[in-house]
Amino acid sequence: DTLSLHDALPICSFPLGPGFWLEGRPIEALPPRPAPARASSGTQVSASGRRITNSGSFAPASSGPKVAKRSRIWVEGRHDAELVQHVWGEDLAEAGIAVQLLEGVDNLEAVLEVFGPTDTARAGVLVDHMVPGSKESRIAEAVSARWSGAVLVLGHPFVDIWQAVKPARVGLERWPDIPRGIDIKHGTLDALGWPHADQRDIAMGWKRILSTVRTYRDLEPALLGRVEELIDFVTVPWAQ
């Protein structure tokens, strides 16, 4: 590689390296840095050209499939799992942490009985609508006492995980208050003016909501902090 001096006639070329001066200071002439690869549409890239995941972390270098660790995270339902995977999926895959379904917090103790949590095989649990005095909080207290140090149960205040998506993403100022006795998913879709007659409509409505979530910035802080804390809990260095 050479540096060409175009002010001279004829044009003079010099090998790159030390020995050049710029504005009265000695410099070393180096070849230009390659431009960072252009990101595909929707992909976040740092100033240095590193890809950023939906959770805001640097994407790991591809190192092939991971063997799942014993430690894992449970969530109440399928929509919870899909949202967690959408935002934190790359981080969890790199750490070898599986996300599994409880199908309701009432099943938590039975699931943990089978799993057998220990300090090295940890269980992180995300619970919907865990507020003081609720059934959810009582179950959380019971399992946390029984498997102290091996189980961490955290909850968010939302009645349904849909409400953890910032309402502006679907054109609302706030999520609608659904009266008791009306299924919150049906009621929410009705308030949005979307189809809500059956489970197919609910599945399509959730898919539509999830598609508006680009990164962690589109989620409420009350969910973000809980998920990050659970990931930290199950990925301590000594966990299996």
Name these PLM-found stretches:
Residues P10-N54:
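Intrinsically disordered, low-complexity, charged/polar segments
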Residues A47-F58, D232-Q240:
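Short, charged, intrinsically disordered terminal tails
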Residues P60-G124:
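Acidic, glycine-rich catalytic loops of TOPRIM or P-loop NTPase phosphate-binding modules used
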Residues D106-N107, M130-S134:
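Short acidic, S/G/P-rich loop/turn micro-motifs used as interaction or catalytic elements
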